[in-house]
């Protein structure tokens, strides 16, 4: 192996970086800070922050604490969570990503404009993802969530359709869903689609395709529960079949590097830079 390169564009997106910085800032002056859910979908980064004093809680536990500081992560929260926090005199440190927050407001505004009209909000995203749960909450739980074009039978085509996307989905999949719905729409039903996929995500997909073909072997670093990690890894794999998904250096197998001259290391928007650097150092014995 001659070269090891870490993708300069991989690592935390703006929203995740901001949430982590806010947590670290609070932990400098406070011994105790709660976070509602994992602050990022990467277990190594969560453990690092837990060692500094961050305490991860779930929604049930939020209902049982009072007068505490709680960080709401970049994925956002539904209105019901804010109600519980306010009732319990929780000091909220709101680290909702600005892109997600703007999307929440847009969905809520359109939903509230429905009044008695026959209309529906449809969300393209992972049904169990925290961001999607928060978005559905903007519609009092009435939004329809579809994970692929195969799910569009859940849509009521007798009602107007307003389609949005989770910010970390694959734009080509969103476009396919738009086409499928357009083919089924019958006048006078209204169909409006809003491509709400984050531009950072789109740019990373384009960049990672180029990065992948520059190396003999790719190590893609991501947590098992990273939604954008799955998408970005699949794009890497399409561009370079010699791509391996790892969560840390323990997943690496020495036989991967036989005859390999160039290794690229990249990751999800939830993958810390320090972890990719640690993995790069672990490859030195294979030189």
From Swiss-Prot:
Pfam families: LYTB (PF02401). Binds 1 [4Fe-4S] cluster per subunit. (2E)-4-hydroxy-3-methylbut-2-enyl diphosphate binds at residues 41, 75, 129, 167, 226-228, 270. One of its GO terms (biological process) is terpenoid biosynthetic process. The keyword NAD does not apply. Its cofactor is [4Fe-4S] cluster. Keywords: 4Fe-4S, Iron, Iron-sulfur, Isoprene biosynthesis, Metal-binding, Oxidoreductase. Pathway: Isoprenoid biosynthesis; dimethylallyl diphosphate biosynthesis; dimethylallyl diphosphate from (2E)-4-hydroxy-3-methylbutenyl diphosphate: step 1/1; Isoprenoid biosynthesis; isopentenyl diphosphate biosynthesis via DXP pathway; isopentenyl diphosphate from 1-deoxy-D-xylulose 5-phosphate: step 6/6. Isopentenyl diphosphate binds at residues 41, 75, 129, 226-228, 270. The active site is at residue 131. It catalyses: isopentenyl diphosphate + 2 oxidized [2Fe-2S]-[ferredoxin] + H2O = (2E)-4-hydroxy-3-methylbut-2-enyl diphosphate + 2 reduced [2Fe-2S]-[ferredoxin] + 2 H(+); dimethylallyl diphosphate + 2 oxidized [2Fe-2S]-[ferredoxin] + H2O = (2E)-4-hydroxy-3-methylbut-2-enyl diphosphate + 2 reduced [2Fe-2S]-[ferredoxin] + 2 H(+). GO terms for molecular function: 4 iron, 4 sulfur cluster binding; 4-hydroxy-3-methylbut-2-enyl diphosphate reductase activity; metal ion binding. It comes from the Bacteria. Dimethylallyl diphosphate binds at residues 41, 75, 129, 226-228, 270. [4Fe-4S] cluster binds at residues 13, 97, 198. It is an enzyme of class 1 (oxidoreductase). Belongs to the IspH family. PANTHER family: 4-HYDROXY-3-METHYLBUT-2-ENYL DIPHOSPHATE REDUCTASE. Catalyzes the conversion of 1-hydroxy-2-methyl-2-(E)-butenyl 4-diphosphate (HMBPP) into a mixture of isopentenyl diphosphate (IPP) and dimethylallyl diphosphate (DMAPP). Acts in the terminal step of the DOXP/MEP pathway for isoprenoid precursor biosynthesis. This is 4-hydroxy-3-methylbut-2-enyl diphosphate reductase. It comes from Azobacteroides pseudotrichonymphae genomovar. CFP2. The lineage of its organism: Bacteria, Pseudomonadati, Bacteroidota, Bacteroidia, Bacteroidales.
């Amino acid at each position: 192996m001659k070269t090891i390169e870490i993708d300069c564009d991989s690592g935390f997106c703006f929203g995740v970086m901001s949430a982590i910085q806010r947590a670290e800032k609070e932990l400098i002056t406070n011994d105790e800070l709660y976070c509602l859910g994992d602050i990022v979908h990467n277990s190594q980064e969560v453990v690092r922050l837990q060692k500094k004093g961050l305490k991860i809680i779930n929604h049930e536990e939020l209902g049982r604490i009072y007068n505490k500081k709680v960080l709401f992560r970049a994925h956002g929260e539904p209105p019901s969570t804010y109600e519980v926090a306010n009732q319990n005199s929780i000091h909220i440190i709101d680290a909702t990503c600005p892109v997600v927050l703007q999307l929440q407001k847009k969905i809520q505004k359109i939903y509230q404009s429905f009044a008695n009209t026959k209309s529906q909000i449809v969300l393209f995203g992972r049904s169990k993802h925290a961001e999607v749960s928060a978005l559905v909450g903007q519609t009092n739980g009435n939004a329809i969530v579809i994970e692929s074009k195969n799910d569009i039978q859940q849509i009521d085509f007798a009602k107007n359709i307003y389609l949005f996307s989770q910010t970390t989905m694959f734009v080509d999949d969103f476009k396919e869903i738009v086409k499928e719905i357009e083919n089924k729409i019958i006048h006078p039903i209204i169909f409006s689609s809003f491509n709400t996929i984050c531009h950072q995500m789109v740019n990373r997909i384009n960049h990672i395709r180029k990065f992948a073909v520059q190396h003999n072997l790719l190590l893609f670093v991501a947590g098992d529960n990273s939604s954008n990690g799955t998408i970005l890894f699949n794009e890497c794999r399409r561009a370079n079949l010699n791509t391996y998904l790892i969560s840390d250096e323990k997943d690496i197998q020495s036989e991967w590097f036989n005859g390999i001259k160039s290794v690229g290391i990249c990751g999800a928007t939830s993958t810390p830079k320090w972890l990719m650097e640690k993995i790069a150092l672990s490859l030195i014995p294979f030189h």
